[in-house]
C-alpha cells in the first residue's frame, strides 16, 4: 500500500491509498461486511454506491466459516467476490464486547465461543495469522479497546498492554512474510497524556497507517473532538489516519475537519434495515405514516438506484410489510448517501472550500457548526 497526499485545507487532507487491487480516494468511508457480506448487497451493488474498500470482521469470520474454508477458496476476496481492497479489524473489539464471558491476560484473551460455548483463545499472533489467511489488504493490530468510562489508572494499564500487543502483532506480521499493510491503533481513552504515550510508542514500532481507537464508545462528542484535535497532528503526515467505528454523517464531517482519512461504521446499513434513512436535510423515518402517500423520491438530490426509481410511499409500503427488498433499497440509498458525502468533502478540500461545505451541511440540517479548536 502507498499513501499519496495531494492537498490540505486546514487540517483536512485529500489523498489516496494505492493498492495492487485498486485505488481508494481519501477521505474514504468503508462499508462494513461483517460476515463477508455487506448485509443484503452483492459486491457489484456495493461498488455501484461508490465504495472502493470494505471492512471484514476477523473475529466472526474466524468462528464462521473458519480459516480452512477461507483457504479452500483462496482468501476473503475470492470467497465473497469483492475485487477491491479489504481492511479487516483484529477481532479485539468483538472479544472485549463479550463482557463476562471473556478473561483478559497478558498473553491474550480467553473467552467462550458465542456460537457454541466452547473455550477459545485469541492473541496478537493468532489475529495476525487469521488476517494473513483472509488476504487482508490492511491488517489491524490486536489491541484492547478500552471501555468508557475508564479511570486514568485502568486506561494507562490497558494502553500499555495494547502497546506490547502492538509489538507482538508487528513481529508476527513480519515473520509471516505478509507484504500488505499493517496499521497500529492509538489508545488511551479520553486522557491526552496517555494518547501521547500511545502515539509515540506506535510510531517507534513503525506502521503503515495509524488508527484512533477507543472513541465513539459512549464518551461525549466534545471529548471525541478534543482527542482527535490533540492526536492527529502527532501522527506522521505521510501515513493514513483511520477513525474506527465512526459514525454518523456529522461525525465523518468533524473527523475530516480534524485530519482523519478513513472511517467505517455499521450505521448506514443497520439504520437502513430499521427504516432510518439519511437525506440531505437530515433523517427520514420511512415507516412513519406521513410517507404512506408520498410520491416523491427519498432524496431529490440523490442519484442512487433507489431514489431514481422508487417513491417514499413504495419504500414505506415495503417497510410496513417487512419485505426484504425494502431493506435492500434502503441500504443502497444509505451507502450512496455516505459515499456522496465523502465525495463532497474531497471536492471541498481540493477547492479550499471545506468550511463553506461544512457550514452548508449543517445549515441544511438546521444545526449549528461545532467549534473547531485547532491552530
From Swiss-Prot:
The active site is at residues 89, 264. It is an enzyme of class 2 (transferase). Keywords: Glycosyltransferase, Metal-binding, Queuosine biosynthesis, Transferase, tRNA processing, Zinc. Substrate binds at residues 89-93, 143, 187, 214. It catalyses: 7-aminomethyl-7-carbaguanine + guanosine(34) in tRNA = 7-aminomethyl-7-carbaguanosine(34) in tRNA + guanine. Binds 1 zinc ion per subunit. It holds the Pfam family TGT. Its EC number is 2.4.2.29. Disulfide bonds: none annotated. One of its GO terms (molecular function) is tRNA-guanosine(34) queuine transglycosylase activity. Zn(2+) binds at residues 302, 304, 307, 333. GO terms for cellular component: cytosol. Residues 245-251, 269-273 are annotated as: RNA binding. InterPro entries: ArchSynthase1/Queuine_TRR, TGT, TGT-like_sf, tRNA_ribo_trans-like. Homodimer. Within each dimer, one monomer is responsible for RNA recognition and catalysis, while the other monomer binds to the replacement base PreQ1. Belongs to the queuine tRNA-ribosyltransferase family. Catalyzes the base-exchange of a guanine (G) residue with the queuine precursor 7-aminomethyl-7-deazaguanine (PreQ1) at position 34 (anticodon wobble position) in tRNAs with GU(N) anticodons (tRNA-Asp, -Asn, -His and -Tyr). Catalysis occurs through a double-displacement mechanism. The nucleophile active site attacks the C1' of nucleotide 34 to detach the guanine base from the RNA, forming a covalent enzyme-RNA intermediate. The proton acceptor active site deprotonates the incoming PreQ1, allowing a nucleophilic attack on the C1' of the ribose to form the product. PANTHER family: QUEUINE TRNA-RIBOSYLTRANSFERASE. This is Queuine tRNA-ribosyltransferase. It comes from Salmonella paratyphi C (strain RKS4594). The lineage of its organism: Bacteria, Pseudomonadati, Pseudomonadota, Gammaproteobacteria, Enterobacterales.
